[in-house]
A protein has these predicted regions:
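Middle-to-C-terminal accessory/interaction subdomains
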Residues: 1, 14-17, 21-244
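Acidic, His- and aromatic-enriched active-site or binding-groove loops in soluble protein domains
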Residues: 1-8
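Surface-exposed interfaces of beta-sheet-rich extracellular modules
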Residues: 187, 276-287
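Disulfide-stabilized cysteine-rich extracellular repeat microdomains
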Residues: 222, 258, 274, 282-284
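Extracellular, modular beta-sheet/disulfide-rich ectodomains of secreted and cell-surface proteins
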Residues: 234-271, 286
Length: 287
């Protein structure tokens, strides 16, 4: 009774009600479709309905992994029925991402390495997985400079940390270590019945699928940056920001969304987008 839960799928622009009411969602959708969100007052109104920080993180995650069976499909969102409740999205069914279904991708996007996923999520098209209505709210938010800068900097934060090649490769390593000992037995048990052109049914096919994930982890960060340069007409130049914390017990440094509490950290940011850096004292300390 305390939650609105909706789903949208490619066959219709109208949300499917799973729980609660669609009234609040339709209100903000219509507001954003009929008002210029580049105007700061309109943006602030929209931000009262949408959890902007959560929206940005969600969009970045879907775009980075290249889940192209989205946003027209596999899209759910919810809002608490409270005075401070705001719409947030639920990430699920992202198995099209990380170069998972290369054969199927050929019919939709051509190639993971060359397809512009940010543009896919921004402007909308005529395909089942990104009709214009499914990208309209995100597109409207990006008309606002404050939101656009926050999106760009947050994306850079993630590319510098959780979406970096080193970290995603580490995650692949850790998952492979768990799964690999059982792959041969799994294939021997189920054999050819596994094969549907996307599911490896030999050890060589399994190793090839894992290698594609490593390849994706290698090329995707640079491609993601290039997509931002293209869509937002950036000059493409980046600066390396290096941060040093002498005493982590006394405080840490916050850059955009990241809290840095190590002696040496560095990340790449676009030179034409301002970033936020501040020193944050721990309890009992001050700067």
């Amino acid at each position: 009774d305390n939650l609105d839960l909706l789903s949208t799928i490619a066959s219709t622009s109208e949300p499917e009600l799973l729980h609660g009411s669609t009234e609040d969602y339709l209100e903000i959708r219509d507001f954003m479709n009929n008002n210029d969100i580049s105007i700061q007052n309109n943006y602030e109104i929209a931000s009262q309905y949408y959890d902007v920080e959560s929206l940005i993180e969600y969009k970045i995650a879907q775009i980075f992994v290249m889940n192209y069976d989205w946003p027209g499909n596999n899209n759910k969102l919810f809002k608490a029925k409270s005075s401070d409740g705001k719409w947030q999205h639920i990430m699920f069914d992202s198995d099209f991402g990380f170069e998972r279904w290369t054969d199927l991708a050929l019919g939709f996007i051509g190639s993971y390495e060359t397809y512009n996923m940010l543009d896919h999520a921004y402007g909308g098209g005529n395909t089942f997985n990104n009709p214009v209505w499914s990208t309209a709210i995100f597109t409207a938010f990006l008309d606002n400079q404050e939101f656009k800068h926050q999106f760009i900097n947050t994306y850079c934060d993630r590319i510098n940390t959780t979406y970096s090649t080193d970290y995603t490769s580490y995650l692949i390593d850790s998952l492979k270590a768990v799964v690999a000992p059982y792959v041969a037995d799994h294939i021997n048990r189920y054999g050819p019945s596994l094969y549907d052109s996307y599911t490896p049914n030999t050890l060589a096919a399994y190793n090839g699928a894992v290698q594609r994930m490593y390849d994706f982890a290698s090329y995707r960060p640079d491609n993601a940056r290039n997509e931002m340069v293209e869509l937002f007409d950036l000059n493409g130049a980046t600066n390396t920001v290096s941060l040093f914390v002498n005493d982590s017990e006394a405080g840490h440094i916050k850059i955009n969304t990241l809290n840095v509490n190590v002696q040496g950290w560095s990340g790449e940011y676009f030179s034409d987008i301002p970033i936020s850096i501040k020193a944050v004292p721990e309890f009992g300390y001050e700067f």
